[in-house]
Amino acid sequence: DTTRQFQWDKIKERLALLENIQLQPSTWAILQNYKNRNGEAPLVRSFKRNAYGRVADTLGIERYQSVPLYLLTDTLVPERYGQDGELTRFIEDGEKFIKAEPMFTGDEWMIPKKYVKVIGDTIVFNKAVFVDRHNQNIASLERSGKGQWVVRSMNPSTTGRHLPPYAQETPLGMFVLQEKKVKMVFLKDGSKETGGYAPYASRFTDGAYIHGVPVNAPRKTQIEYSPSLGTTPRSHMCVRNATSHAKFIYDWAPVNGTIIFVLE
């Protein structure tokens, strides 16, 4: 299947979801555990090892960099993992846990406080980026009025590929833009040696960034385009773009105020 298209039907569905969840006043939060910075999540009740030799829940969400989700009736052993960066509705505060509803995972869960970053009840999500793993493209849209969204960009991209042990797919989900770097320096596989950098990097989950064409050391100057964009998955997990488009996203999309949808 070499025909590439933008899946506007799926994009419309997700925009409707994004509008509908904002109709009622909510306190929004982000699940966070980048590089296990908030502590390795406890083992879920039933787990498996994936192709990378890492523990994952029964739905395939890895333990590494993820957040433990507990049933409302049992805060001893987590049931599932929630993804770093997932948009979450904060429902109720507690002593060690909060009750919250991760938007992509669904349902209400008890989540240890240290994994939840509350971003408040005044935030409005008027900007959304859609990454399509199947068609290898990216689109950005901005809300111009009730039920109205304008397309700001449509571009070819490449997403992460399944290639153990280092490269893996860009995860599906509904994420909040978490941080931005003008240069995201990367290491050579399996080493501590610098491999180069990716320009205009915007991180949304785990180590996955939307970024420009990677520049391999010793080269320092930026590269605008790669003929592989829009073809097949080829990155470690990141979403590779033409560098000028990565800069557009970097300049246009606010941290904690932009939603990134990864769809199939």
Predicted regions and their residues:
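Short beta-strand/loop turn elements enriched in aromatics
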Residues: 40-65, 223-229
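Short, flexible surface segments
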Residues: 81-84, 171-172, 255-256
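Gly/Pro-biased beta-strand-loop elements
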Residues: 112-221
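Short, structured beta-strand/loop micro-motifs enriched in basic residues and often containing a Trp
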Residues: 62-74, 237-243
